[in-house]
Each structure stands twice: as structure tokens, then as C-alpha cells.
């Protein structure tokens, strides 16, 4: 019996040790995901699902000589597409003149995951390998980013096993319920850049404007500050500008944890108002009159209670300061 137990232990040792040695950590898998994005020529067809609505999209990437190009297009409804050529992003959206920003990033969480600062993100999220699965007919490894406090959504990513390319992204709430999803349905890894991306790289684009010059006002001290922010969030930008299509001037503040961006607007209340709340998938829009009789609007991919707590915490830094 003792000899049998020894043999079983030795067998288990030979089975388990190589598996542990070969299994990369969650952090290593996310690093591979970001390297893969910059390394491969590929086209990914995917859908964005939120509250029963499905939006088909296509994300493409290629390496052209010494340049790198990415293209994101929404395939239904009003035309929206975004072109990234090296560090310049061109925006093409229905109802707006096209424009190009230098030093910006493509909009949306899908693009944010591909370029996020992992070291910073790991300060407020714990990466965990949760297993293997299949997406779009391909084997994948699954990694979860669990928030270190319950004020934020968690994320689950599915990474194609051989390349590391991102194929699926889920946003989940504290209970694990799905809030929003990006799901790849077909991946094509190409031996060379597609003709489509080659032609886009040669297209005449709007003149690039540095992000710092895109605002009508320089970064300034608004005289307001949030008394509370979720773990990892810091103030990234502040300015004062008119709202698009109106003459109403608002104080603007953008906060971020390196993955999720939240916009905060403050303006003088023109009339008594009740609180307004709109939630679309992971995006919460909260509009309220705070204790200082100032209208506050918070917009971002955070749970409603978090948006409300941010809004309620805003306070003037000096008596008498109002938008």
C-alpha cells in the first residue's frame, strides 16, 4: 500500500508541475494581448450587446512599413468610424465635421483594453485566470479583472489561445450579472495588410490638432473638487466651455482610473429641477441639483450609485464660487 501511494504521488507530481510551469499568469496573458494587437494584421467582426440592443462592428489592424493603422466602424444606423494612424485618431461621425486629434485614443472600452497602462490598472483591479473556452470557433483563455472595491464594474476578457488577440469583453456588476458585452464572431488573421487599410492610410485626413489644443480653454482650476472618487480614479482634465449647440457654459472635469473615463459637468441651475437618471448598458447618466444649488451631470461606465456618490461629493473650494 505504501509503495502504491508513493507511485501515485510521483505521478501527480509529473502531471501537475509542468502544467503549473506552462500556465501563464493573468498579467502575462494581458501583456500578450497588447503585444498581439500591435503585432498582427487582422480583421475582427464583432457585436456590441447592451440591454437587448445589438450593434455590429468591425475592427481592423495592420502594420504598414513603419506605420501602424487601426480602423473601427459601426455597421448599423448612423455612420460612425474611427481611424488611428500611429498616434493620430480621425473621427468620422454623422452630424459632425470630421476631425483628427494627435495623442488621443480610440473611443470605447474595446480600444481602451488594447492600450491601457497595465501597471496603473492593476492598482485598482486584480487580474485572475478563470479557465478556457471557445469564442468564434477558436480556443481562448479567460481572464477576469476584479475591482478591488465594489464601486466599479468588473471585466472578463477572452483571449485567442495561440495569438493572444482579444475576442470578447464582458462588463459585469458586483453580483456577476452581465451589464454590457463585446463579442467577436469572426477573426481573420492576414499574412499582409488588407487593401482596404492600405487605401485608408493614403486617404486625405483632417489636419491633426494636439489634444491639449482641442479645448477652447486651457486646463484651469475650476474652484470645485470631488470629495470622493472610486479607487484608482484621478482628475485628468478640467476646462470651461460652451455645450455643443448651445450658449450654455459649463465647467468640465474628466476623471479616469486608466481604463474607464467619467465626465463631470457643472453649470448654474436655471430653474428648479428633479434628478434625472438614464442607464444604457454600462453607461450611467445622472443629472441632479446638488446641495450648493448647482446642476451636476455625471456620465460614464460606472454603476449608478457610484455616479451619484461622485455627484453628491462635489463641493466648492472657496465660499461663493459658482459656475
Model-derived regions, located:
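Bacterial N-terminal signal peptides that target proteins for export
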Residues: 1-9
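Short, low-complexity, Pro/Ser/Thr/Gly-rich segments in the mature regions of secreted, periplasmic
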Residues: 307-322
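Gly/Pro-enriched, hydrophobic low-complexity segments
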Residues: 136-205
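Short, well-ordered beta-strand elements
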Residues: 169, 292-301
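Acidic/charged, solvent-exposed loop-and-adjacent secondary-structure segments enriched in E/D, K/R, S/T
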Residues: 91-113
Amino acid at each position: 500500500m505504501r509503495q502504491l501511494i508513493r507511485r501515485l504521488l510521483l505521478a501527480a507530481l509529473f502531471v501537475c508541475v509542468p502544467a503549473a510551469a506552462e500556465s501563464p499568469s493573468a498579467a502575462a496573458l494581458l501583456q500578450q494581448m497588447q503585444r498581439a494587437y500591435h503585432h498582427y494584421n487582422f480583421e475582427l467582426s464583432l457585436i456590441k450587446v447592451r440591454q437587448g440592443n445589438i450593434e455590429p462592428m468591425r475592427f481592423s489592424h495592420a502594420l504598414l512599413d513603419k506605420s501602424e493603422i487601426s480602423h473601427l466602424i459601426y455597421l448599423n444606423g448612423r455612420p460612425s468610424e474611427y481611424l488611428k494612424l500611429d498616434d493620430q485618431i480621425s473621427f468620422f461621425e454623422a452630424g459632425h465635421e470630421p476631425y483628427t486629434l494627435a495623442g488621443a485614443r480610440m473611443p470605447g472600452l474595446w480600444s481602451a483594453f488594447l492600450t491601457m497602462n497595465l501597471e496603473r490598472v492593476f492598482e485598482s483591479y486584480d487580474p485572475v485566470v478563470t479557465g478556457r473556452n471557445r469564442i468564434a470557433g477558436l480556443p481562448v483563455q479567460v481572464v477576469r479583472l476584479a475591482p478591488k472595491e465594489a464601486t466599479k464594474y468588473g471585466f472578463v476578457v477572452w483571449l485567442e489561445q495561440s495569438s493572444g488577440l482579444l475576442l470578447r469583453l464582458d462588463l459585469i456588476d458586483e453580483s456577476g450579472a452581465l451589464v454590457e458585452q463585446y463579442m467577436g464572431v469572426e477573426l481573420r488573421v492576414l499574412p499582409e495588410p488588407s487593401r482596404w487599410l492600405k487605401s485608408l492610410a493614403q486617404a486625405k485626413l483632417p489636419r491633426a490638432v494636439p489634444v491639449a489644443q482641442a479645448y477652447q480653454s486651457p486646463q484651469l482650476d475650476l474652484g470645485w473638487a470631488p470629495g470622493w472618487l472610486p479607487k484608482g480614479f484621478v482628475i485628468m482634465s478640467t476646462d470651461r466651455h460652451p455645450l455643443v449647440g448651445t450658449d450654455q457654459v459649463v465647467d468640465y472635469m474628466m476623471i479616469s482610473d486608466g481604463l474607464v473615463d467619467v465626465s463631470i459637468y457643472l453649470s448654474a441651475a436655471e430653474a428648479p429641477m428633479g434628478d434625472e437618471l438614464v442607464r444604457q448598458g454600462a453607461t450611467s447618466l445622472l443629472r441632479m441639483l446638488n446641495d450648493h444649488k448647482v446642476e451636476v451631470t455625471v456620465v460614464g461606465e460606472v454603476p449608478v450609485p457610484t455616479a451619484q456618490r461622485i455627484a453628491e461629493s462635489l463641493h466648492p473650494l472657496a465660499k461663493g464660487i459658482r459656475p
